[in-house]
Regions:
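Domain-level marker for long, solvent-exposed, non-transmembrane regions
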Residues: 23-173
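Bacterial Sec-dependent N-terminal signal peptides
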Residues: 1-27
Length: 173
């Protein structure tokens, strides 16, 4: 009886360990996908002063991962890419003109964009994480998910200036 209980306990522990490993690998895969920075940004409207309201289209094999990665992609896009405007909604240039800034300052941006990193202070999902049917597209073996987010650009710029990643707006004069 004791031997059976011991074997059962060992099997349960092995299964839990296997599940933890598989889960960790899928999270690493999602982070690897994010590091490729495959996304598109479109203007959605004007937010309150100092914020941008944008839709981020993120690619991922799992829709739930794409929704979370959209926040990282939104902040990344505001800093490094900017976005085009639409009729009645102006586009915005990237916060930096230095295309190599992310690689040059990797010691800052790697932890900044890590899961739960500092980027979370500047972005929020406006539709409570729900995605409309038209914003969930199957493209080959993966999904293209559109999520509307609000990015506090004024606070983001101030934080990046304080960290020395961007020059202040008044530094050119």
């Amino acid at each position: 009886m004791k031997a059976t209980l011991k074997i059962g306990s060992i099997l349960v522990l092995l299964m839990l360990g296997f599940i933890a490993i598989v889960s960790a690998q899928s999270d690493r895969k999602a982070n690897r996908d994010t590091r490729e920075w495959r996304y598109e940004i479109e203007a959605m409207g004007t937010g309150v002063q100092g914020t941008y309201l944008i839709k981020v289209w993120t690619y991922s094999k799992r829709p739930d991962v794409a929704i979370e990665q959209a926040k990282k992609n939104a902040v990344h896009g505001i800093i490094f890419r900017g976005f085009a405007g639409k009729p009645g909604i102006p586009g915005q240039r990237a916060l930096t003109n230095n295309v190599n800034l992310e690689q040059e300052k990797a010691e800052f941006f790697d932890p900044f964009f890590s899961d739960g990193g500092k980027y979370m202070k500047f972005v929020s999902i406006t539709n409570d994480g729900s995605v409309s049917a038209g914003d969930r597209l199957k493209v080959g073996k993966e999904y293209k998910i559109g999520v509307i987010v609000s990015v506090n650009v004024a606070a983001l710029r101030a934080d990046l200036e304080n960290a020395g990643m961007l020059k202040g707006l008044s530094s050119g004069f």
